Curated annotation (Swiss-Prot):
This is Probable nicotinate-nucleotide adenylyltransferase. The keyword ATP-binding applies. Catalyzes the reversible adenylation of nicotinate mononucleotide (NaMN) to nicotinic acid adenine dinucleotide (NaAD). It catalyses: nicotinate beta-D-ribonucleotide + ATP + H(+) = deamido-NAD(+) + diphosphate. InterPro entries: Cyt_trans-like, NadD/NMNAT, Rossmann-like_a/b/a_fold. GO terms for biological process: NAD biosynthetic process. GO terms for molecular function: ATP binding; nicotinate-nucleotide adenylyltransferase activity. It comes from Geobacter sp. (strain M21).
Length: 216
């Protein structure tokens, strides 16, 4: 099975997250995409102190109508800081025969050298970097950490960066939905509409639970 992996705080999950997952699923012929909410993100504080359980429930509501999507609570169960390398190793142990595709945003990929054991990620899975409009796979190569750049070679026929492990880095371009969780939180705090930015079921959950009313 070809398994996509999309992590994040999902605070809250929104339509751009879903569209990115769907485009990756379609373009790279993924059988499933698993959404993995972070319990304790290591690189930034969790705004609003929203519980893991609430964020997990919003993701479950968001993906309920898509049979190609699934949700995992593994980072909440594991506890501690939610390092990607630990999650990927756990997934690989659970799915030893599956091909993993780790979906990350361009900003995160640009900072990947700051991640825990970042070099080991490429030996565990393929990486799909969601690029800003107009970016290319060659520009992606330019931000590879110097320490591991020699492990990759550009494959023009497949338009990807091949890693010596047999995995590859792909550039997913053209996802044009400019939606952010921080903007949604501000809209809720200001009493404004968030319709069409998030799934209806998630909007209803936010209203019922009075989430983000005092968000900063």
């Amino acid at each position: 099975m070809r398994l996509g992996i999309l992590g994040g705080t999902f605070n809250p999950i929104h339509n751009a997250h879903l569209r990115i997952a769907e485009e990756a699923r379609d373009l790279y012929e993924l059988d499933r995409v698993v959404f993995i909410p972070a319990a304790t993100p290591p690189h930034k504080p969790l705004v609003g102190e929203l519980s893991f359980a609430s964020r997990l429930e919003m993701v479950r509501l968001a993906v309920a109508d898509n049979s190609g999507f699934m949700v995992s609570d593994m980072e909440g169960v594991r506890g501690g800081r939610s390092y990607s390398i630990d999650t990927l190793r756990e997934l690989k142990a659970e799915h030893p025969d599956d091909e993993l595709f780790f979906i990350v945003g361009a900003d995160s990929f640009n900072d990947i050298s700051t991640w825990k054991e970042y070099a080991a990620i490429f030996g565990l899975c393929n990486v799909i970097s969601v690029q800003r409009p107009g970016s290319t796979i060659t520009s992606l190569a330019e931000v590879l950490p110097v320490a591991i750049a020699g492990e990759f070679c550009y494959d023009p026929a497949a338009n990807r960066l091949n890693h010596c492990s047999g995995h590859a880095v792909y550039a997913l371009d053209g996802v044009l939905l400019d939606i952010s969780s921080s903007h949604i939180r501000l809209l809720v705090q200001g009493g404004r509409s968030i319709r069409y930015l998030i799934p209806d079921a998630v909007e209803q959950y936010i209203k019922e639970q009075r989430l983000y009313v005092d968000a900063r």
